[in-house]
């Protein structure tokens, strides 16, 4: 196999760079033979800032600029500077905005400033704080504030899934199922909440738990990786979810993002929002 092509990818935004980073990373995932050096330039608000970016680029290398810049003058300046230095410059949102505008015959809002602190931003911060405070069954006294409740046995990715959802703006409580201990929630009182169970292949869970014990230098906890106990835990969670008609997601072959996306689909359906079908 030949050497990988090397690309210096410069991601530029007058906002947080979150959008351009997400799109760029999704795009380069399609090129496994490509080695990418990523440079993130966020909160670019002046022509002098653009000048510094352009001057820092090594023109002997393969360079590509991907950007989201709302300000018309600054955007044009970036494009002209890149063109002058023979650097390819790709807008992320311009085509989409143009298509929406043409399709609906409406002009884009000239006063839109997505990088300003918005209600959505503060709601996201609130969701993150709430979710952290309610990790691993903590602070269940105000569970009514949750949008989503996740239950599952130990090491089924409840916490990272919860944090990912919180970053999307959902307040999440995750509750561990402990063998022979009743779940500390009243299922009848949660009828209006989305409660989701996470399950996993038994052998896979034992492997994850064994690796966890090794990393903690605690290999004496035999029950934690006992096939019989793990099987009982999984069976009990499955039974509880079936009894309460809670959706159950098998995370054995799922990434955190895929699990979260499935949960969001369940949330949208429960709240009569468009979200498509969820496949577990």
UniProtKB/Swiss-Prot annotation:
Residues the record lists as binding ADP: 152-159
EC number per UniProt: 2.7.11.32, 2.7.4.27
Keyword Signal attributed: no
Pfam family, one: Kinase-PPPase
Enzyme category, top tier: transferase
InterPro entries found in the cross-reference section: Kinase-pyrophosphorylase (IPR005177), PPDK_reg (IPR026565)
Catalyzed reactions per annotation: N(tele)-phospho-L-histidyl/L-threonyl-[pyruvate, phosphate dikinase] + ADP = N(tele)-phospho-L-histidyl/O-phospho-L-threonyl-[pyruvate, phosphate dikinase] + AMP + H(+); N(tele)-phospho-L-histidyl/O-phospho-L-threonyl-[pyruvate, phosphate dikinase] + phosphate + H(+) = N(tele)-phospho-L-histidyl/L-threonyl-[pyruvate, phosphate dikinase] + diphosphate
Keywords: Kinase, Nucleotide-binding, Serine/threonine-protein kinase, Transferase
A GO molecular-function annotation: ATP binding
Family membership noted in the UniProt record: Belongs to the pyruvate, phosphate/water dikinase regulatory protein family. PDRP subfamily.
HAMAP family in the cross-refs: PDRP
Function: Bifunctional serine/threonine kinase and phosphorylase involved in the regulation of the pyruvate, phosphate dikinase (PPDK) by catalyzing its phosphorylation/dephosphorylation.
Annotated protein name in UniProt: Putative pyruvate, phosphate dikinase regulatory protein
Species in which this protein is naturally found: Anaplasma phagocytophilum (strain HZ)
